[in-house]
């Protein structure tokens, strides 16, 4: 299932990059686009590709986060595994499109914690760090995050072109 969702992230990022690249002002530029989401294994990869629209686009992340915590109430840590997934597409001036995928593995914590993040960061717990993604410094989060991993991969590809 995760592989299929990963392919959807890649397809959506690629489509966005290609559409933007067709605009005259970007025709001779490298255009980057991304699609990302939170996959919770116990919830069959929800909210997944619908992460931004989960429970409705106008629903605050405070409410979304609490709803996910409520759904996982009583679920042991070993079954709370989750990951942030990011696909980054680079549409090139020659029409070629490169796509990479980055992930950050963790678990869904038991409470909302931290002030440095956004979205689902306050419930995404990193056991190796002993804190949520929202409790990391911005520098540490960039080093560990799914987007950071994806950007490192796409940068390497761009430097080789």
Regions found by a protein language model. Give the residues of each.
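Phosphate-binding chemistry for phosphorylated carbohydrates and sugar-nucleotides
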Residues: 10-25, 44-45
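Hydrophobic alpha-helical packing residues
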Residues: 17-20, 68, 154
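A glycine-rich beta-turn/hairpin centered on an aromatic-Pro dipeptide
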Residues: 79, 83-92, 102
């Amino acid at each position: 299932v995760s592989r299929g969702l990963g392919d959807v992230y890649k397809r959506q990022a690629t489509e966005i990059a290609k559409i933007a690249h067709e605009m005259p002002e970007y025709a001779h530029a490298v255009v980057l686009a991304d699609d990302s989401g939170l996959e919770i294994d116990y919830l069959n990869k929800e909210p997944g590709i619908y992460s931004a629209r989960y429970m409705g686009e106008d629903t605050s992340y405070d409410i979304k986060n609490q709803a996910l915590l409520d759904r996982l109430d009583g679920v042991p840590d070993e079954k709370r595994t989750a990951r942030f997934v990011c696909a980054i597409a680079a549409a090139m001036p020659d029409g070629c499109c490169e796509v990479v995928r980055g992930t950050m593995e963790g678990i869904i914590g038991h409470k909302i914690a931290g002030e440095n993040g956004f979205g689902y960061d306050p419930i995404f717990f990193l056991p190796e760090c002993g804190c949520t993604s929202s409790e990391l410094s911005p520098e540490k989060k960039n080093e560990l995050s799914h987007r950071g991993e994806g950007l490192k991969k796409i940068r390497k590809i761009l430097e080789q072109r």
